[in-house]
């Protein structure tokens, strides 16, 4: 509906809805063409940026479900998550590839830069879409784990659809909404930001983490960028 409107803004680039979808379809085509996975876990290990949203959408378009991995997460926790997910595919970029290879071993690792260069395979993606149903898993987020072991919470497409329908109707979010994202993508508060943006055509600003240490600078950033909606803890 708003192809040339800003969808996601981070400190390095502004991505329109058209660009976001195009990047996601390239990523989905790469996953489908090189790994032949469906209804399978795919993790991503990336710095927080607009590329994370492209990856999230690309994984969903490929018929799989995603788990964000924080680049600051201890190796022991990452290993437990990977063990729980039972050999997931991992998406990372060239910057983080050496780190990822240390804990992934011989498991499948997809480089984001390669995926973005992959031609969009419309037929393959449409075939995947035709086989998907609303109860398919969309993501698995891991809690801190009170026992020391991270526990995965499984959420399906229908749950997110119903939640975002309720959120947008209750709070009257629309294309004029400007979201200020604070929550990490591995935390469920980010679901409101991401999927409100995708449903309504709102713009989501990924606020640089440094601003949260300086309240006045944070308020100036929000005022400059006309941010009118926040969901923070």
Model-derived features: positions:
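Conserved AMP-binding/adenylation subdomain of ANL enzymes
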Residues: 151-180, 188-229
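Conserved AMP-binding
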Residues: 46-49, 70, 183-190, 210
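Short, surface-exposed, polar/charged, turn-prone segments marking secondary-structure boundaries
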Residues: 71, 88, 117-119, 207-209, ...
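Short hydrophobic "strand-cap" motifs at the C-terminus of beta-strands
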Residues: 11, 140, 182-183, 207, ...
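Carrier-protein-dependent adenylate-forming modules in NRPS/ANL systems
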Residues: 1-161, 171-172, 201
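A conserved hydrophobic position in a structured secondary element of the catalytic/binding core
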Residues: 92, 111, 155, 182, ...
